[in-house]
Structure formats: structure tokens, C-alpha cells
Amino acid sequence: MSTRFEGSYLGNAARLADDAVLECKICWHRYDPAVGDEVWQILAGTPFAALPAHWRCPQCDGDREQFMVVDD
């Protein structure tokens, strides 16, 4: 079974691969675990599923549940 899926994350961390890149559906900001998040002081190598519960989009303050998996 693949750990990748199409569409919104909706809080289901079990469906995310550790290297999954996710994109905010409001402002299109991408969270790339290889880069992390400087605004929230998230270290590179941190999977989206391991982000703190209070984490929000650093660009538009959107809910993390609004992020979609990028399938490049």
C-alpha cells in the first residue's frame, strides 16, 4: 500500500510519507521536510506529521489540515 495520497492532509498523519512535501491550499506555501520551517524554527529533516499541533502555515496562518500533498 502506498503512503502517498491525493488531496488535503485533513490530519491523517498515518497516510503521509516522511519525505512528503505538502502545499497550503490557501496561499500555495510548500512545507518541505528537507528544508524545515525557519519561521516556526522547525529543523530540516522534520516530517510534516511530526510538526507540533499548533503549527500553522507560516505565510498565511492557515490551518495545517488545509495542506495538500504535492505529487511531483
Swiss-Prot record:
Q: Which amino acid positions bind Fe cation, per UniProt? A: C24, C27, C57, C60
Q: Name one GO biological process term.
A: alkane catabolic process
**Transmembrane region(s):** none
- Domain annotation Rubredoxin-like: ranges: 19-70
What keywords are annotated for this sequence in UniProt?
A: Electron transport, Iron, Metal-binding, Transport
Highest rank taxon of the organism: Bacteria
Q: Which cofactor does it need?
A: Fe(3+)
Entry cofactor note text? Binds 1 Fe(3+) ion per subunit.
In Gene Ontology terms, what is one molecular function of this protein? iron ion binding
Provide the disulphide bond pattern: none
Family the UniProt entry places it in: Belongs to the rubredoxin family.
What is the role of the protein in this entry? Could be an electron transport intermediate in hydrogen oxidation.
Protein name, please?
Rubredoxin in uptake hydrogenase operon
Lineage runs: Bacteria, Pseudomonadati, Pseudomonadota, Gammaproteobacteria, Pseudomonadales
Gene name for this UniProt entry: hupR
